[in-house]
């Protein structure tokens, strides 16, 4: 065999090995798993007092690239004012900016007690996610860690597009 033929064979084998290594890495690389339990008092400057009678608990769980987000609304007496549960997948994790991009594909809503006023935040989140799900089949949601204290296991997190800041 000629020298050129050996070089061609070596290059083909090397490229094949590199391709196999890349394939193994992509199949074995696991997405980040995380869990956040967050809370926030609701306040809307435009509405004033009407929305300050509620608080919000947000639970976010991500495992193996799938995500579940539960928004639970309560009045100050602890009565449920409604829940919005969303499920989807984690599209991207930006570790430098501490940001998670989630594509929500399903949503379920439960209204609180009969006759109880729903928080403005509930109404907005229900409306905007409904539009996106009906139009595109998915609702994009981002979660960004604004501040973090690992010693106290605490973080301040921003949820978009609902523009909600929570302590987690």
Model-derived regions, located:
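Extracytoplasmic/periplasmic/luminal assembly and interaction segments
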Residues: 48-99
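Non-cytosolic head/periplasmic domains of membrane-anchored proteins
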Residues: 94-168
């Amino acid at each position: 065999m000629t020298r050129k033929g050996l070089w061609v064979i070596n290059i083909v084998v090397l490229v094949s090995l590199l391709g196999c290594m890349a394939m193994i890495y992509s199949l074995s690389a696991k997405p980040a798993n995380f869990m956040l339990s967050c809370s926030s008092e609701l306040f809307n400057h435009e509405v004033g007092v009407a929305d300050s009678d509620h608080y919000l608990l947000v639970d976010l769980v991500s495992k193996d690239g799938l995500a579940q987000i539960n928004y639970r609304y309560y009045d100050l007496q602890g009565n449920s004012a409604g829940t919005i549960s969303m499920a989807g997948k984690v599209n991207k994790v930006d570790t430098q900016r501490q940001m998670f991009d989630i594509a929500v594909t399903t949503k379920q809503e439960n209204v609180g007690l009969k006759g109880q006023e729903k928080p403005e935040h509930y109404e907005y989140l229900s409306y905007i996610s409904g539009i996106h799900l009906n139009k595109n089949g998915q609702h994009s949601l981002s979660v960004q860690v604004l501040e973090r204290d690992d010693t106290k296991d605490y973080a301040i997190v921003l949820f978009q597009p609902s523009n909600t800041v929570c302590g987690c």
